[in-house]
Each structure stands twice: as C-alpha cells, then as structure tokens.
C-alpha cells in the first residue's frame, strides 16, 4: 500500500486577521474570488457541492459557480440528476472552494432552491451551442450502455437544431444556495491556520475566529 504519512508542506503565503474581513461574507467571498481569478489558478469557480438524501446518506461532486449575488451562489444542472433529486428530498447543502495554490479554502453551508425560469433562460442562451445541445442529450446520472450511444444522442439533437436556436429544456435549470454559514480558511505556519466563520443572525452576520 502506498505510504502517505510523510506527504506534507508548510503554508507560507500569509495570515488572516479580523480587521481584514468585510462585514458581509458575500463581499468577502467576492474579494477572494477576484484574487483567485487574478492569480490565474486553475478553475477558480469549481466548487464541491455536497448533498444528502432523505436518509442522510451524503454525496459530492464538483460543479461550477455561475453567478454570485447578494442572495447567494448559483449553479446549473439537470433536474433529473442525483444532486437535484437529493436537494428535492433535503435542501440543506454544502459548498467548498479549494484554492490550494493560494493556501485558501471557503466553505458554505446553506439552503438550495430552484431559481426562476427567466433567470435560467438568461444563462442558457449565453452558453455555447454545443453545451446547450449536451443539456438535451444527457439524461444525467442515469445508466447508459456506452459513450457511443451518448454521442449518437448528441449528434441527433445537433442535427435537429442545426438551423435554429436550441430551446431551454424543461428538465434543466439553476439552483441558488442561500448561505447560513460561511467559513474562510487561510493556511498558516506550524499548522496554526487562520479560520473565521460568519453565521447568520437575522439580517446581519456574526463573525468569530475558530481554532485551527
């Protein structure tokens, strides 16, 4: 079995203090996201989405953050997917942004719900046409016999909509995660990392430092 216990490194890129934080976790996240984009780290909008079914059994996958606003975090998916089915059963979810190259991570706990048709449509029409076609071609999370069959379905849809716009599927759309708790983590020397948690208190947020 491969040995893992000696794989480690020091965290040297700097600390995080309370007076550096915005009063709003959304504003603080926007600052960190802008810095992640500017740093040209790979896939800065990639986030781990954790859901659970009605029995509490969890699942995770990486999805892309496609919109950030004052209300929360928006992603898109097939409504028949496992994640969508689990959100329908139990709407509490968790997001995680692992920005390893910046020695940072952000965790978000909140409630997911579908966004409006108009909001979904606005995003869908902005997608590349092949991505629009892929939304139609894939019955996400369902068993499929081969990749060849998937490509056949894709090509059939592509032919169908070759001379016109691709309509928005009624089985595809967006979710917004409204945060109730957000944690910002900055790596520190000697494993003395800096952690700050925002917790919603009515219309405001309480901020506390956590032990690493």
UniProtKB/Swiss-Prot annotation:
Cofactor: FMN
Record's keyword annotation contains Cell membrane: no
UniProt binding sites for substrate: 8-11, 66, 123, 127, 131, 191-193
Reactions mediated catalytically: pyridoxamine 5'-phosphate + O2 + H2O = pyridoxal 5'-phosphate + H2O2 + NH4(+); pyridoxine 5'-phosphate + O2 = pyridoxal 5'-phosphate + H2O2
Class of enzymatic activity (EC top level): oxidoreductase
Keyword tags: Flavoprotein, FMN, Oxidoreductase, Pyridoxine biosynthesis
Binding site for FMN: 61-66, 76-77, 82-83, 105, 140-141, 185, 195
Pathway(s) served: Cofactor metabolism; pyridoxal 5'-phosphate salvage; pyridoxal 5'-phosphate from pyridoxamine 5'-phosphate: step 1/1; Cofactor metabolism; pyridoxal 5'-phosphate salvage; pyridoxal 5'-phosphate from pyridoxine 5'-phosphate: step 1/1
SUPFAM superfamilies: FMN-binding split barrel (SSF50475)
UniProt record, GO biological process: pyridoxine biosynthetic process
Pfam short name (any one): PNP_phzG_C
GO molecular-function term, one example from the UniProt record: pyridoxamine phosphate oxidase activity
Cofactor binding note of this UniProt entry: Binds 1 FMN per subunit.
Keyword Flavoprotein (UniProt): yes
EC number(s) recorded for this UniProt protein: 1.4.3.5
Subunit structure: Homodimer.
Similarity comment: Belongs to the pyridoxamine 5'-phosphate oxidase family.
Annotated HAMAP family: PdxH (MF_01629)
Chain's role: Catalyzes the oxidation of either pyridoxine 5'-phosphate (PNP) or pyridoxamine 5'-phosphate (PMP) into pyridoxal 5'-phosphate (PLP).
Record's protein name: Pyridoxine/pyridoxamine 5'-phosphate oxidase
Gene transcribed to yield this protein: pdxH
